[in-house]
Structure formats: C-alpha cells, structure tokens
A protein has these predicted regions:
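Glycine-rich adenosine-cofactor-binding loop
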Residues: 1-14, 188
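Rossmann-like NAD(P)(H) cofactor-binding subdomain of soluble oxidoreductases
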Residues: 8-12, 27-88
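A generic structural motif
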Residues: 17-24, 56-57
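NAD(P)-dependent Rossmann-like dehydrogenase/reductase catalytic/cofactor-binding core
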Residues: 18, 159-160, 164-226
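Rossmann-fold dinucleotide-binding core
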Residues: 61-127
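Active-site rim beta-loop-alpha module in soluble metabolic enzymes
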Residues: 105, 111-153, 159-164, 171
Length: 226
C-alpha cells in the first residue's frame, strides 16, 4: 500500500524477484501474508489498526522509524538509506523491529530483502543517527555546491568536486576512525575558521552559525578523542 518512493521501489523489487504482489488502495479484508504499508508517518497508526482488525491472518510492515505501534503482527522495516523510486533494494540492509517472530522472519527472507533484527522499537537516538547520516549530509552537500557555484564554478564541476571530497572523506573516516577526520577544525586552525565564518556571515548568517557550531563541535570532539 503506497505509491511513493519506498512503495514504488519495493513493488519493482518484488516484481523483479518474481514474488507475487499487488498494490492496494485501501485496507483489504480477510487476507493473509504480508502487507507493506509504505505511507506517510501520520497515516501509519490508523492504517495498522484497521488492517490488523480486518485481517487476523496478516502481518503488517511499515517503514516509519518515528512510529511506535505495539502488536505481535506489526513490524517496522527501516531502510536506513535514502530511497527513491528507482532504488535497487537488493543493495540495502534494512533494520527489522517488533516482537521476535521466527515464522514471520522466514516469510520476509523469501522476498529477498536483506535485514537484521534489532529489537522491539528503535530509540530516538537511532532515528537521530539516521537524520545525521542522511539529512545533515544532504543539506551540507547542497550548501557546499551552492557556495562553489556562487564563487564561479559551474554546476557540473561543483558536483564533481563536492562528490569526490565527500566520498574520500567517508572512506578515510570508515577506514581510520577519528584519525580520518581532516580540515581546519581537526587541525585547530582557528584563524582560518574565523575568516571563513565572517565571509559566510555576509551571505547567510544562519548558515554561518551552523558552520561555526559544527566546527566548534569537531574541534572539541577531536581534542577529547585524540
């Protein structure tokens, strides 16, 4: 149920895997198997209640890490990834949440989706980690490209430069941990940071504030851990 990014990507994945499936527009009645609810966060709880009431033999799966719902037939399958309609789900590791149920997990494995069972409900810190990993990265990448373009770089060159820096930075930190953190804050170069802060302030005071807060946090983090 649902025709957004996750719903479409999931439907395409199941079809390619030759798993029998169909898209439904409303809660079915007296069905069995697995119903995937790829709907907005606000719609998850009422739909879960309706689906489980009308279908005693069904397992319901939703994708909203911010939604908690207590039932031995309701599960959260969280992608911990940025999904669009063309995403290849066979490359994504999902986290599975809910009451431990080996028979349901066997059914889910038959779909070909990769997942790891993580417990009853995710904590707010789990979701905060996803926000930091995904949304923060997306936001700062877009801002970094805009800064390059405002300095005269083309959109194409800006994207190539930012992409290679992001990818190499992630490679370094995954390989070397805190030793892979580079840049003026990691080196304690406060004069450079101050100069860049004031330059940013002339363009966007809010962004400059985020820039300063992030660099202050990096400086403290590296100092405490090294």
């Amino acid at each position: 149920m649902g025709r957004g990014n996750v719903g479409t990507a999931l439907f395409n994945f199941l079809q390619l895997s030759e798993i029998a499936c169909e898209i439904v527009e409303k809660a079915p009645e007296n069905k069995s198997g697995i119903l995937f609810l790829a709907v907005s966060d606000s719609a998850v709880k009422p739909l879960l209640e309706e689906v489980l009431q009308k279908n005693p033999g069904i397992f319901a799966v939703h994708f909203s890490a911010a939604t908690h719902f207590e039932s031995d037939r309701a599960f959260l399958l969280h992608p911990f990834s940025s999904i669009n309609k063309k995403s290849e789900l066979n490359h994504i590791l999902f986290t599975l949440w809910g009451e431990k149920n080996p028979s349901f997990e066997e059914m889910l494995k038959k779909t070909g989706l990769k997942f790891v069972y993580c417990g009853g409900n995710p904590t707010p810190l789990y979701h905060a980690s996803a926000v930091m990993s995904g949304n923060f990265t997306q936001f700062f990448v877009l801002q970094a490209m805009q800064l390059l373009q405002s300095s005269g770089f083309s959109k194409e060159v800006s994207e190539k430069l930012v992409r290679q820096l992001v990818n190499s930075s992630l490679d370094n930190v995954f390989r070397d941990g805190i030793k892979g953190v580079t840049g003026p804050a990691a080196r304690g170069e406060k004069e450079i940071l101050s100069e860049e802060f004031y330059a940013l302030s002339e363009k966007d005071m809010e962004l400059a504030g985020l820039f300063k807060a992030a660099n202050d946090a990096i400086l403290r983090f590296v100092s405490e851990k090294s």
